[in-house]
Curated annotation (Swiss-Prot):
This is ATP synthase subunit delta. Belongs to the ATPase delta chain family. HAMAP family: ATP_synth_delta_bact. It comes from Aliivibrio salmonicida (strain LFI1238) (Vibrio salmonicida (strain LFI1238)). It is a peripheral membrane protein. Its main location: membrane.
Length: 177
């Protein structure tokens, strides 16, 4: 686990708890997403690395974000600037989204297939994963022709490799041992 993730977690948890209390989960995702993008800007990154006073940095950051931040979002920016932590806003966003998915019982599932899946196949895979994981599943589908045939499914800690390439690899390992 990276240091940035460890630093970001308390800020994400505080923002998330506040958002739950105020019933503003999606509004906070939008604010954190916007702030995350601002920190990725080349000029802003240089400013964050510079020797700007925290209060001045917070003012600049908030003025750039404008109406994208409500007063509570601005408070978060002030606190993070005081602690020299504005650079971790992308990690705060990532941690916040993980907390939101856990709260809403949603999990992202990556489906890699050898060919493009039909809508019916996607629906079937999604339904079976939801039943198995007892969560709502958001599918992210991609194609990798190197699989030859079949699919690889990754959802949280669950990995199901039902591809021909995976089967051939396991067969090769078995024969070599």
């Amino acid at each position: 686990m990276s240091t940035m993730t460890t630093i970001a977690r308390p800020y994400a948890k505080a923002a998330f708890d506040f958002a739950v209390e105020k019933n503003e989960l999606n509004q906070w995702v939008q604010m954190l997403t916007f702030c995350s993008e601002v920190t990725k800007n080349k000029d802003m990154a240089q400013l964050l690395d510079g020797a700007v006073a925290p209060e001045k940095l917070a003012e600049i950051f908030i003025s750039i974000c404008g109406e994208q931040l409500n007063e509570f979002g601005q408070n978060l920016i002030h606190i993070m600037a005081e602690n020299g932590r504005l650079k971790v806003l992308p990690d705060v966003l990532d941690q916040y989204i993980l907390l939101q998915h856990e709260f809403e019982k949603v999990i992202d599932a990556e489906i890699i297939s050898a060919i493009e899946l039909t809508e019916q196949q996607k629906a079937d895979i999604g339904a079976k994963l939801e039943a198995r994981l007892e969560r709502k599943v958001k599918l992210n589908c991609s194609v990798d022709e190197a699989l030859l045939a079949g699919v690889i499914i990754r959802a949280g800690d669950l990995v199901i490799d039902n591809s021909v390439r995976g089967r051939l690899s396991r067969l090769s390992e078995t024969l070599q041992s």
